[in-house]
Regions:
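Fe(II)/2-oxoglutarate
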Residues: 1-42, 206-239
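Generic beta-sheet signal
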Residues: 3, 44-46, 172
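Non-heme Fe(II)/2-oxoglutarate
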Residues: 23-105
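A general structural signal for short secondary-structure junctions and capping/turn motifs
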Residues: 37-39, 104, 133-137, 163-165, ...
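Hydrophobic beta-strand residues in large extracellular and virion-surface proteins
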Residues: 48, 60, 88, 92, ...
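A broadly conserved detector of short glycine/acidic/proline-rich loop/turn motifs that flank catalytic sites
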Residues: 51-52, 132, 178, 197
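Conserved double-stranded beta-helix
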Residues: 70-155
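Catalytic core of Fe(II)/2-oxoglutarate
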Residues: 140, 151-239
Length: 239
């Protein structure tokens, strides 16, 4: 009984105590390319060509590519200023068709860099899967994936909508739990910028609870465990 009580405190009380709003302080002065072209849209997804302006894309490559090649971490959290910038969020909102906001600061899946290299073991991402939704039914959660550097032969498949080459500076918005997809590549390397957004303002201490239903809270716990375990696994498997 004592063990159960301690677990409940860890699960429900500790997050309230440790919450601290994240400060996105890496300023790369990025912007969305005004000439981007939306070429595919369906239930749970939007695909856009040339989503970032070229200066922004190159800054991301110059800042993160060499570091990613050296440490070969699957995920590297980055506090990019434009992730929570109102102007940038407005530009993305216009592409998706609804208002977008940063996720809660207690979410580990927020804004991060992911690096893939030829021959790496990444089996999970080669199978069909949904992105995990960490919020309640009244909140939509989107993941934006952008290959800011890509020399690979990557193919992106959305179940029921076909397969297309996933090329440099493409932007793919995926709604969590509403878009079954997979990504495959055999050759080359890729540096991805990945950002999670929601369509409701939920970044405060209480919103960690009020914006999630029971399933969403369970998925948040699951996501915390998955993020840590998968990073350790891929680090060991690909060392």
């Amino acid at each position: 009984m004592i063990i159960v009580f301690i677990l409940l405190i860890i699960i429900f009380v500790v997050p309230f105590l440790i919450y601290k709003r994240k400060v996105d302080d890496i300023d790369l002065n990025c912007d969305v390319n005004p000439y981007n072209r939306r070429f595919m849209k369906g239930e749970g997804f939007v695909v856009v060509d040339n989503i970032l302006d070229e200066t922004c894309r190159q800054k991301l490559v110059d800042t993160f590519l060499d570091k990613a090649k050296k440490n070969k971490n699957l995920n590297e959290d980055v506090k990019l200023n434009f992730y929570s910038n109102e102007h940038f969020l407005k530009q993305l909102s216009e592409i998706v068709g609804e208002d977008l906001y940063p996720v809660n600061s207690l979410d580990l899946q927020r804004c991060w860099i992911r690096y893939y290299f030829e021959g790496m073991k990444s089996q999970y991402y080669e199978n069909y899967h949904h992105d995990i939704k960490r919020y309640g039914g009244d909140v939509k959660q989107y993941r934006l994936v952008i290959p800011v550097y890509d020399t690979s032969d990557t193919m992106f498949t959305i179940n029921g909508h076909g397969t297309f080459p996933f090329e440099e500076n493409m932007g793919v918005f995926l709604e969590a739990s509403n878009c079954l997809h997979k990504v495959e590549f055999k050759r080359g390397e890729r540096l991805l910028l990945i950002m999670d957004f929601i369509n409701k303002s939920c970044d405060n201490r209480l919103s960690h609870y009020t914006c999630r239903n029971f399933k969403g809270y369970f998925n948040w716990l699951r996501d915390v465990a998955w993020r840590n375990l998968s990073s350790v696994y891929y680090k060991i498997a690909n060392s």
